[in-house]
């Protein structure tokens, strides 16, 4: 049965300690599997420093169009506190309906379903009217500078064209199949340093306390009403994530205070426009400050195409519920892929991602396999 193949493949993938940005042999293993099934495999390593070196795999079966691509990342976040796990995080454990292991949800489970669905499809239809491909990286959970982005640039220079991508990020909220992502919010990180004047707490008139201004500015920032959301996006949101003064001395007013905050923004904005709004709010306060920002992603949303409608129908047929077309969640490699290919993000439930005792359900793996397999039938059978 297919689920047994999925579990066998997933067990092997989980056994690789592929903590970002290291493949630890996992992509090489996948390449061998796919090569044996007739895929042409291309492995590229990007990054100059040892700690940057990232393994990327592009595998393709066939030369025709459309090219249906299973995209994803084999890297996982560290398990941390392994002593708090009930089982070895890098050894798949099946207990009843639950399947435990680091990456089962995010996102080795989806990769296993994609691999098995492709191999089983090709056993029945060895000459599809199109191509099947895989685009996999070991650098998504980290900086993502040496993974999917440069691999896509490399493939474009070679003339490779991907027509439709399925990115197996965990998307389900309450039930399998309840959400399909066709876009993502943008993200921009800020570091604000407010400069005061150090002094003795007993003589505050000789000092300028930066904390006083920092608290007022933080309040104003959190009260910014950026927008009311848009058709596919929720309201833009700002969260203060750190407030530091670096002062452990009880009788000193510190020299400076540092605020760090993140803004997740919709398609009304860009990172630059968000910076302008933030700067305007801070500038209303009479303080000396330094403001730096860095964006990891701009927002994007794609046109809801015919292929996306067909994919939605496949999901609904499997789950028996109409999926929500969504753009929420964290950043993903879809921010790179959508520039080269139509893309949907669809995978398992995100509520277990990055958690201790990360796990998924056997029934969800079976359902995901069915969706992926039926997608190949839909898009590649004339």
Model-derived segments and their meaning:
Residues 71-73, 135-137, 165-169, 193-195, ...:
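Short beta-strand segments
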Residues 42, 69, 133-135, 290:
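A structural signal for isolated positions on well-ordered beta-strands in alpha/beta enzyme cores
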Residues 97-113, 200:
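Glycine/serine-rich anion-binding loops at beta->alpha junctions
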Residues 1, 171-175, 182, 188-382:
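Metal-dependent amide/peptide-bond hydrolase catalytic core
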Residues 45, 136, 293-295:
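Residue-level recognition of beta-strand->loop/alpha-helix junctions
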Residues 2-99, 123-128:
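Acidic/His- and Gly-rich active-site-bordering loop/insert found
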Residues 19, 75, 141, 171, ...:
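Catalytic metal-binding/acid-base residues of hydrolase active sites
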Residues 107-183:
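Acidic/histidine-rich catalytic neighborhood of metal-dependent amide-processing enzymes
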């Amino acid at each position: 049965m297919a689920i047994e193949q999925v579990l066998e493949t997933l067990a092997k993938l989980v056994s690789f300690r592929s903590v970002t940005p290291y493949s630890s042999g996992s992509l090489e293993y996948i390449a061998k599997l796919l090569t044996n099934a007739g895929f042409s495999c291309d492995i590229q390593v990007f990054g100059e420093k040892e700690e940057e070196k990232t393994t990327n795999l592009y595998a393709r079966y066939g030369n025709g169009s459309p090219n249906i691509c299973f995209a994803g990342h084999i890297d996982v976040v560290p398990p941390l506190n392994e002593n708090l796990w009930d089982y070895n995080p890098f050894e798949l454990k099946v207990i009843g309906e639950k399947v435990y292991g680091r990456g089962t949800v995010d996102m080795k489970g989806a990769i296993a379903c994609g691999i098995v669905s492709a191999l089983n499809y090709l056993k029945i239809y060895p000459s599809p009217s199109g191509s099947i491909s895989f685009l996999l990286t070991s650098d998504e959970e980290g900086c993502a500078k040496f993974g999917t982005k440069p691999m896509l640039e490399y493939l474009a220079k070679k003339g490779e064209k991907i027509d439709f991508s399925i990115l197996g990020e965990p998307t389900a909220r309450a039930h399998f199949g309840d959400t399909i992502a066709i876009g993502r919010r943008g993200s921009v990180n800020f570091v604000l340093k407010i400069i005061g004047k150090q002094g003795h707490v007993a003589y505050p008139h000789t000092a300028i306390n930066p904390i006083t201004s920092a608290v007022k500015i933080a309040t104003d920032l959190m009260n910014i009403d950026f927008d009311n959301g848009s058709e596919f996006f929720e309201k833009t949101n700002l969260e203060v994530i750190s407030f530091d003064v670096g002062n452990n001395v009880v009788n000193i007013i510190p020299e400076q205070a540092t605020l760090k905050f993140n803004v997740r923004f919709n398609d009304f904005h860009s990172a630059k426009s968000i910076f302008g709004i933030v700067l305007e709010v801070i500038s209303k306060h009479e303080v000396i400050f330094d403001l730096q920002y860095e964006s990891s992603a701009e927002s994007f949303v794609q046109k809801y195409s015919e292929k996306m409608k067909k994919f939605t129908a496949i999901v609904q047929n499997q789950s028996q519920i109409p999926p929500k077309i969504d753009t929420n969640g964290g950043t993903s490699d879809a921010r790179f892929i959508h520039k080269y290919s139509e893309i949907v993000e669809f995978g398992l439930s995100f509520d277990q991602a990055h958690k201790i005792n990360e796990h998924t359900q056997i029934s969800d793996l079976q359902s995901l396999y069915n969706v992926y397999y039926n997608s190949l039938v839909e898009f590649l059978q004339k």
